[in-house]
Amino acid sequence: MAHNLALGAHGEDLAARYLTEAGMEIVDRNWRSRYGEVDLIAAEGDWLVFVEVKTRRGLGYGSPAEAVTFSKQRRIRLLAVEWLRDSGRHWSRVRFDVVAIMIGHGPQPQIEHVRDAF
């Protein structure tokens, strides 16, 4: 379990750096409520982006992006509503992205950013 938590935290760090280098601003990380946790919340222009990060070392359990099930999507939407209410800020546009990371297949991690994933 600790190994999975460390892998997940490493993946979130990689994703945050990747998104920042792509011009996004990280607004919040690991925001929690009774519904669970949002990995990253970022701003890109007038978009507020809720980002689910999935990190894998292999494809034994499927690709990282495939791990974002309908149930997980629904939970992230609930979290987004709570975050928006609690933040007190208004965003004209909101979207949900997935950053899928494969580690251990070559010298560099493979990062796939799926915009507006759900």
Curated annotation (Swiss-Prot):
Q: Which domain of life is it from?
A: Bacteria
Q: Which SUPFAM superfamilies match?
A: Restriction endonuclease-like
- List, in alphabetical order, the Gene Ontology terms for molecular function in this entry: nucleic acid binding
InterPro entries xref list: Restrct_endonuc-II-like, tRNA_endonuc-like_dom_sf, UPF0102_YraN-like
The family line of this record is: Belongs to the UPF0102 family.
In Swiss-Prot or TrEMBL terms, this protein is called: UPF0102 protein RHA1_ro06551
